[in-house]
Amino acid sequence: MPELPEVETTVRGLRPPLEGRRLTRVETRRADLRRPFPADLRQRMTGATITGLGRRAKYGLIETDRGDVMVFHLGMSGRWRIDPSEIGAHDHLVLETDEGRTLSLCDPRRFGSVDLVRGEELAGFGPFKALGPEPLGPDLTGAHLAGALEGRVAPIKAMLLDQRIVAGLGNIYVCEALHMTGIAPTTMAGRIAKKRLDRLVDSIREVLAAAIEAGGSTLRDYARPDGELGYFAKQWRVYGREGEPCHCGTVIRRRVDGGRSTFYCPKCQK
């Protein structure tokens, strides 16, 4: 599933062809999606000018001069394509601009979603109501984590994946940040000292910034809007590296909890 760096990279890639441009055509191409498109999407978006693009957690935001915000989630396999050579069966949404550019939202597994929300109602949009602070913003601090995790007996990894505590983190980058900080993923969250949480916040930011710089991590379907892959997988410290040596020489291990793989070094992470 695309995580924060992949969504941020996608948003940045969509800005050049979309920002400041008027949509001359909006076509929804499938009615049997898991989450159907809003019935009035074409009516409200056709003719609108895109005034800005942003991100909240793992959601992309496309703002218009009409006060609407198109909120998209890439699901498991979604990605945007700029000027595709052809529109395929998995291109479920197609946008055309007054500059003659074509953008398509391709989602083979159909777990993604598109919603249309009034800008003034965005904070109350269902998935956004209980989101925690953005990990790259000023509100995520060691003090915030200390307060949110106080008394919690759940593993730190599970807590970091809870979007109510930190918005946008996913499996890859939590594994990487915990390894960088030297915290075992099974450590009970409420027992971690404030100083270690301060370092954890720094590690989260460092990992995410590096991933965005590399264009995210391509696993199967993800690619940037221009078709380029994400190359952060070449920098993974532990994720996806079961049986390979950590930088300390210890063999990296994998455990499975709730169907999700966790990668860690038993020596470096305590």
Swiss-Prot record:
GO terms (BP aspect): base-excision repair
Enzyme Commission number(s): 3.2.2.23, 4.2.99.18
GO MF annotation: an example: 8-oxo-7,8-dihydroguanine DNA N-glycosylase activity
Known cofactor(s): Zn(2+)
InterPro entries: DNA_glyclase/AP_lyase_DNA-bd (IPR015886), DNA_glyclase_Znf_dom_DNA_BS (IPR015887), Formamido-pyr_DNA_Glyclase (IPR020629), FPG_cat (IPR012319), MutM-like_N-ter (IPR035937), Ribosomal_uS13-like_H2TH (IPR010979), Znf_DNA_glyclase/AP_lyase (IPR000214), Znf_FPG/IleRS (IPR010663)
Subunit annotation: Monomer.
HAMAP family found in the cross-reference section: Fapy_DNA_glycosyl
Protein name: Formamidopyrimidine-DNA glycosylase
Taxon lineage: Bacteria, Pseudomonadati, Pseudomonadota, Alphaproteobacteria, Sphingomonadales
Gene that encodes it: mutM
